[in-house]
Amino acid sequence: MSEEKAKSNTSRAIGIDLGTTFSCVAGYISGKVEVITNQDGERTTPSVVSFDENNCTVVGTAARNMVGSDPMSVIFDAKRMIGREFDDPKIQNAIKGWPFKVVRYNHREKREEPNKVSEGSNSYDNIAIKITRNGKTNYYAPVEISGKVLLYLKNAAEARLGGTVDSAVVTVPAYFEEPQKDVTKAAATIAGFDPNKVRLLAEPTAAAMAYGHIQTQKNANFSAKEDVLVFDLGGGTFDVSLLDFEFNGAAGSLGIVKAIDGDTFLGGQDFDNLLINYCISEFLKKNSSIKQSDLKESALLRLRAECTRVKAVLSSATSSAIYVPCFHMTDDLNVQITRARFELLCDHLFRRCMERTKGCLLRSAGVPEVEYSADGSKLLLNPSLEKTLNEVKNNISKVLLVGGSSRIPKIKALLAEYFGAHKVIEPVNADEAVAYGAAYQAASIYSDAVDAGSSLLLIDCVPLNLSIETAGGVATALIHCGDNIPIKKTETFTTYEDNQTAVTINVYEGNRAMCKDNKKIGSFNLDGIIAAPRGVPKIEVTFDVDHNGILIVTAQDKQTGKENQIKVTNSQNRLSQEEIERMTKEARDNEQRDNETKEKMGKRMAFDQAISSFKAFVEKANNISEEKKSESLRVIKENEEWLSNAQRPEDFEVEELERRSNDFQSFTSDIMKDVGMGGAPAA
C-alpha cells in the first residue's frame, strides 16, 4: 500500500473501551483496525489512577504499583462510581472493600457533607474520593478519574497517529443508566475530546461489530444470516446481547440488536472479592489472635493483586497458591486454592450470568415480562415459555466470548453445555474486542477511511416504552420496547378542555397502561395555544431517540407554529435495572387490570365527549323550546358534576358510568327527535 493510500485509509477517530479494571484503545490505521499500545508498551491499561508526592497524576501500571507505598492514594473502580449517588446500596457495599476514602461531596459548593446514608435520595454525582497527602486534602469526582484514564489513552493514540485526536467512540455497558452515560461523555470532554465528536456505544454491540468486521475481512463475498449472542463478562460489568446479522458480501452487512440484558455490578472484581474473603477467613482461622480489623490496607491491596493473578492462573492450571509475605506483621498468608474451590465460591455468580443470558433470549422473542429471583441468581420462568426459550437458543449460530472474565473455564463450560461447544468462540482477543469494534465504528462515523464494500451497520434498540400522558392518566406510547434506534415518531393530540391555551407534556418510561405505574422522566409546557373548543387545536408531539439513546421530545401547535421541547438526558428520574425488572413483573401481573383500566377510562372519555358535544348543540340551537333547553342544561350539569368527581379509575365503578352513559344517550336521542334531528349529536 502506498504512503498516500495508507494515509487516506487511516482515521484520526479512535475507539476506547473504558473498562472497570482494564481499558484499551484502538484505531483504524492503514485500512485495518490496530490496538494501540500505551506508553509502557502494553495493549491494555489498568484503569487505575494515583498521585505521587508532588500530587502529579499517575495512570495505569505505574499507579497500580504504588499500592505498596501509598495504598490510600491508589484509585480504581471509578466506572462503578460514575453517575451513581452516594446512597446507592451498591456503592455503600463497595465502600467496605475500597482502601481509598469515598465521601459524600457537594461538587457545586466544593464541600464534604456528612456520610450518613439517607432514604430515598436522588442526588447523582455526589461522590468524591478523598486523598490526603502531606497534610493537604484533595477531592476527586469519579468522572475526573475516568477522564484521566481517557486522557492517558488519548495521548497514546496521538503518539501513534502523529497528531491531535479529538473524535472517539467510547463504550459503555448496555445496561448503563442515563446518568452514567452522560457522565461518561463528560469524562471524554475532560480528557480533551470534542463533545460533539464523542459517540457512546454499548460494549456488546462494539464486540459484535468487531466480529462482523472480521467476518467480512476474511471473505469479502461472505453472505449469510446469523443469530449471534455476545457474552461480555468484564472486570466490573456483565452484558449479554442478541443480534441478527445479515452479511451481504460487497454490499455491506447489517446487524440488528434484538435484545439486551445484564448487570452493571457483576464481573471479575466480584470473583476477586470472594477469593479475598476466603483467604482472609483461612488466615484468621490459622491465626486466631489476629482480628480482621488488625489487617492493614496495604496488606489487603497486596492480597487483592495476588488473588487477581491466581484467578487468571486457574484458567489454565487446576490449582495454585495465594501467597502474601508478611501479610500481618511477620505472619505470611499462604492459601492453597484449587479450581474446583474457586468455582464453588463463585458458583452463584456464574449461575447469575447464565440466567441473565436466558433472560436475553426471552426478550429477543418479544417476551417483556422477564423476572428474576431477589438475588438475581434464578430466572423465574413461566413453564409455557420453556418451548420459546429452547427455540431461540437452538437458533443461535455463535456465542461470542468478550471480556477477560469470559476466559474462566467454568463460564465456557456452562455456555458450551447450554448452547453447544462448537458455537462458543473467541473471534478477537477477549480483552480487545470491544475497543476493536469501537475503533471501526469511529472510523466509519468520523472519517472516510473505511471502504464502502466492507461497511457494517449495527442498529441498537430501546428497552422500554416511551410515552406521554393523555386524558385520564393513560400512557400513550410513541416509541415501543424493542424499537430500533435511532428512531423518530410523531403523533397528533388535542386539548380536552374548552378554551385551553396551554398543555403540559408529561413524558414517561415503562410498559404499563397507566402513567402512575410508569416512571416520569420529563415534563414541559406548550403555551400560546389559541383558545378554542376542546378537540379543535392540533398538537403534534415528536419523540426522537438518537444513536446515544438520548431522547428529545418536541410539541408544536400546528395553528400557531409555536413549539417547545425537552432533552431527556442526565435525569435523576431515569430507571435503574432493578426498577425495570420490578416494572416488567408488575406489567405481567397486572396486564388484565391495566387493560380493564384503559377501557374504563376510554368509556369515561367517550361519555365526557358526548356531554361536551350535546352542550355545544344545546347552547347554539334555535329550534329547541326553553323547557327542553332548561331540562337539557340540568342533565348536562348533573353529569358534568359527576364526571368532575370521577377523574381517576378508582373514583367510579364502570357499571355506574355505563348506566349514566346509556341514560344520557336516551335523553339526547329524545331531545334530537323533538327538534327533528333524528339522533344524538356526534361525539
UniProtKB/Swiss-Prot annotation:
InterPro entries membership: ATPase_NBD, Heat_shock_70_CS, HSP70_C_sf, HSP70_peptide-bd_sf, Hsp_70_fam
Localization per Swiss-Prot or TrEMBL: Cytoplasm
UniProt KW keywords: ATP-binding, Chaperone, Cytoplasm, Nucleotide-binding, Stress response
Organism domain of life: Eukaryota
Gene3D superfamilies per the UniProt record, alphabetical: 1.20.1270.10, 3.30.420.40, Actin, Chain A, domain 4 (3.90.640.10), Substrate Binding Domain Of DNAk, Chain A, domain 1 (2.60.34.10)
One GO location term (cellular component): cytoplasm
GO molecular function, one term: ATP-dependent protein folding chaperone
CDD domains, per database record: ASKHA_NBD_HSP70_HSPA1-like
Pfam families: HSP70 (PF00012)
Keyword ATP-binding: yes
Family indicated by similarity: Belongs to the heat shock protein 70 family.
Name this protein carries in UniProt: Heat shock protein homolog ECU03_0520
